[in-house]
Regions:
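Cytosolic regulatory regions of ion transport systems
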Residues: 3-544
Length: 544
């Protein structure tokens, strides 16, 4: 009896025993992002009385448990259960009740900055994991799967591997497209995105009222049928995602509105307009897209995509200057290809020692509109952030000595613990890469269609998010400020064929406690005193 009991204890300690769960979130793998994913899922599960996250990885169970306990103090209503084993093994997947899971998240074992052969192998393991889950379900419909895959080819393969829901995220593609948009908008757009992807803030929901739309309805009318929640677009009966459609686009009985809201419990649809706007005109002056001068520091897996996306956005006369420590032939090949496709943009790639203060000074950083500082990779996340911070300090020293207007400094941060240091370096827009990707993966595990919205939001065609000056919407020629209900801002944006998600108060732009001046989806009756320096957060086709 003693030996059997000891063997059973040893099995439990090694994490080999059966998991008796249903409707749980199953995570396969245990990497850098695991803590951020768990935090997001705990937030998403707050309204559930008893939720479970089950993790299967080839790590030691005790090590996984200790790491989770050491970094997460409050699990609210969520239980986190770990099991040790090979994630592609069908018997192991049966032990963690993969077929009964609410959703499955597959972590990629290779970071985006790792060598290509390592990433290819990691992608192959993700594909094998998907096939193993399909096998566990005996070919029947499987739980929704969200995974991260580096190769576009393998991503397409993953999404078409079965009849079930498989959503594959390409970290480099998503982050690159977002960074490109940050370079073109006013400061603060990263705060909007961070709020949108995290469960601890506002999110978009696919909404249809139980009693129907209450008669004929078009998209423009739908904007005024919610007090604070804001429709961003339509998910039609054919499965299409259409963000900021023309206002006369009908919302049919089978369509869902894509609604930006604090929570699905805060979405209330009214059959009649909730606000009667008085604004019926907007400033008539034509705003032309202005040329930009943008610098990119360092060559990474993201640089090429960022350059391509910026070229697709930028108007004639713009300049893109990339500075690298070692110039390679493939960089010139990309530059020549882009120059041929976008002859109206001046593109250059130059070799510079970015660690040399004098060489940096010769670049005249103060003459750029935006400077994008990318992390070139490293052995650890801390090492990568340390490099970025040291480069920021050198640029900051040059800008202080020039005492001119600073360019917009944008950087990516790997570890959210380094945000305060980054902000004190003069950065006005930043993106916590690990956190951002983890949040999207967690969100897509709860709502698979969310990834389709992000894919639409981060491409040059159609509408993207911008923070535009209030003077685009209201005439300030005779007044320094205007006081009005937020509903008038919604109406002014609609007259410009835009949807707004909120405001940016200029005086609070440096205040982290006030979300850097960002106010999202207030009630339409809430009054604001708006100055021309303030901004409106718009879903629009371009920056004008």
């Amino acid at each position: 009896i003693t030996s059997v009991f000891t063997a059973k204890l040893d099995e439990l300690r090694r994490g080999r025993s059966l998991v008796l769960e249903n409707d749980h979130t199953l995570i396969l793998g245990f990497g850098d992002r695991i803590l951020e994913v768990i935090r997001e899922l705990i937030e998403a599960n707050e309204s559930e009385p008893d939720a479970a996250i089950v993790i299967l990885a080839d790590n030691d169970k005790e090590e996984m448990d200790n790491m989770i306990r050491d970094n997460i103090s409050d699990f609210v209503t969520t239980r986190v259960i770990t099991r040790s084993g090979v994630v592609t093994n069908i018997n192991n997947l049966r032990k963690v009740m993969a077929a009964n899971a609410k959703s499955v998240i597959i972590m990629n074992s290779a970071a985006s900055w790792r060598p290509e052969d390592e990433k290819n192998l990691a992608d192959a393991l993700v594909l094998k994991s998907i096939m193993s889950i399909i096998a566990v379900c005996d070919g029947d419909e499987h739980p929704p799967i969200v995974c991260e895959i580096h190769s576009d080819r393998d991503r397409n393969l993953a999404e078409n591997i079965s009849n079930g829901d498989v959503k594959a995220l390409n970290e480099v593609s998503v982050l690159s497209r977002m960074i490109a948009q940050l370079a073109l908008s006013r400061n603060g757009l990263s705060v909007v995105y961070s709020d949108m992807v995290g469960f601890d803030g506002n999110e978009f929901y696919f909404y249809q009222p139980d009693g129907g739309w209450g008669g004929e309805l078009n998209f423009g009318e739908s904007l005024n049928r919610f007090n604070s929640s804001t429709p961003m677009g339509i998910h039609n009966a054919n499965g299409e995602i259409i963000l900021n459609p023309p206002k006369e686009t009908p919302v049919n009985d089978d369509d869902e509105l894509i609604v930006f809201a604090e929570d699905d419990s805060t979405i209330f649809y009214f059959n009649e307009p909730v606000f009667q706007p008085k604004v019926n005109t907007i400033p008539s002056s034509v705003v032309k897209p202005r040329s930009h001068r943008i610098a990119l520091l360092n060559w990474t897996t993201k640089t090429g995509i960022i350059l391509e996306k910026l070229c697709s956005y930028l108007p004639e006369g713009s300049e893109l200057c990339t500075y690298v420590s070692d110039k390679l032939p493939e960089m010139d090949i990309l530059k020549n290809s882009l120059s041929e496709s976008y002859p109206h943009i001046n593109i250059s790639i130059k070799e510079v020692d970015l660690n040399d203060l004098e060489k940096l000074d010769e670049l005249e950083p103060q003459e750029f509109d935006s400077i994008l500082i990318l992390s070139p990779g490293g052995t650890t996340i801390e090492e990568m952030d340390a490099y970025v911070i040291s480069l920021l300090i050198r640029i900051r020293q040059i800008l202080i000595s020039k005492s001119k207007k600073w360019p917009k400094l944008i950087t990516e941060v790997m570890d959210s613990d380094n945000i305060d240091i980054i902000l004190n370096s003069g950065v006005e827009d930043f993106m916590v890469s690990n956190q951002f990707v983890s949040q999207i993966m967690a969100q897509v595990s709860e709502e698979p269609l969310a990834l389709d919205v992000y894919d639409d939001l981060f491409q040059a065609e159609g509408s993207e998010l911008y923070i535009k000056p209030a003077s685009f919407y209201f005439d300030f020629s005779e007044k320094e400020s205007l006081t009005m209900p937020y509903g008038e801002c919604v109406q002014a944006a609609q007259l410009r064929n835009e949807v707004i998600l909120g405001l940016q108060i200029h005086t609070d732009q440096k205040n982290r406690d006030k979300m850097f001046g960002i106010v999202l989806i207030p009630d339409k009756k809430d009054e604001f005193t708006i100055r021309k320096e303030d901004g409106l957060i718009a879903l629009a086709e371009d920056e004008t």
